[in-house]
Amino acid sequence: MIPFITPHSAKAMPPKLFLALALSVPLASQAVEMDWSGFGTVGYATSDQPYKYQRFIDNQGTLTRDSVLGGQVDLKFSQQFGATIQGKLAPSDKSDTQWDGTLSWAFISWRPMDDLLIRLGKFRLPFMLNTENSDVGATYDFARLPVEVYSIAPTTDVVGLSISKSLFTDPMEWNLEAYTGKAETHWRYYGREIRDVRNSPGSWFIPVDIKSSGLVLTARDLDNTFRIGIHEVIAERTDQPVHADIPYRSIPVGPNIGFYDLTKGRRVDQLIIPVQTIAASISLPANFKVTTEYARIKVNSASEGLTRWGAYLAVSRRMGDWTPYVYYAKVKSPDSTLEKYKTINENRVPSSPFYNANLINQSQTLAADIVAPFDQWTGAIGSSYRITPTSLLKAEWSHTSTGVVSSFVDAPSGGDSANKQINVFSVSYNFTF
């Protein structure tokens, strides 16, 4: 009955599959070289509101939102062949109360020429500038990557094939990467009054099969990075067809009485979801850096609020071991979708002996939650402090203001997420070893 919402990490590639890939590599006569490393973040976040924001943050404080522990092994079989395995322990992609161990990377690589790299297996997708290294907090200065942008990718990793070609020109290095692959992931919903099969508020997670293909061009030198990408995602539910709309159904007991019916409507087997991204990180005099990223996605389903754009602009300055920064981020669904959400959310039927008005009215709240729009902005100020070459201490204060609705907010029963003001304080220790 329910379509889609916010994506989370894909499942780990089965170990037997990776073993089969590794055994297919023609080993050289010399011994295999192996390097290993680890990474982690211990992050605490608290807000000034009693309801959850970004799944975990409220005024009780949490270590769950940003904490992660992981490790990586790099194998070099020869000058041309290698393999990488990266695993992590982090909050589950299918539960708000559990932690899971998963593989983020598990691929073999072949470099037939210095400027050509082929990877086969599980790998992170080159969506935004920090998507591939988002779990390694020591590699960027933000206490938390702007959710307005980094939540847009329908999945962050796939099992498949990646081919990248590099071109070196003075002073830039150009890299063109084409990829295709599949993922099994879960997308999250939150119901304010009722959820999919329970007559109580809460979250639920829908299993989704994804096929993703894309072409990404990246240009960089020692100080600057530019990226543009086009992606096509094919998503389908594993248990039933996807509802493409939520039709209005009149009740013949009086004028203008009816409801939006979740049990009816056009259904499709899969969704074709285009995604476009563009990003730049530019170094300026006096150790200033300007970073901006933009992403856009279109989803033609009952969850039409997932169609949205997100962007942010950040300015930072390195001052010795300190790197203070400020950023402004915004995410917004189309105005027509926000109006549809308001119409469904405000729709009510009067009491009548001919139907259960309470059940119908609860279903309208659920239908509005399923539309799942976004309308919010965030301003943040923070800093990182480099304790050692491999560890960072970060602190950040952010203020989020919602408009018509924000599906990042688990709104309390009897209310909604409109016109909310949320202050979040975050502190974290980030390390590699």
Identify the role of each PLM range:
Residues G43-Q49, K88-K94, F127-L129, R144-V147, ...:
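Sequence/structural signature of outer-membrane beta-barrel proteins
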Residues Q86-L103, Y150-A153, I194-I210, S301-T307, ...:
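Outer-membrane beta-barrel proteins
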Residues T62-L69, D100-S104, T155-V159, D209-S213, ...:
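Residues that define the transmembrane beta-barrel architecture of outer-membrane proteins
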Residues E33-F39, G43, Q60-H186, S213, ...:
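Outer membrane beta-barrel
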Residues R111, I228-I234, V242-F433:
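Outer-membrane beta-barrel pore domains
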Residues I2-Q30:
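Gram-negative bacterial Sec-dependent N-terminal signal peptides
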Residues A45-S67, G191-W204, A411-G414:
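Surface-exposed strand-loop-strand hairpins of Gram-negative outer-membrane beta-barrel proteins
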Residues A31-K52, N423:
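Transmembrane beta-strand segments of Gram-negative outer membrane beta-barrel proteins
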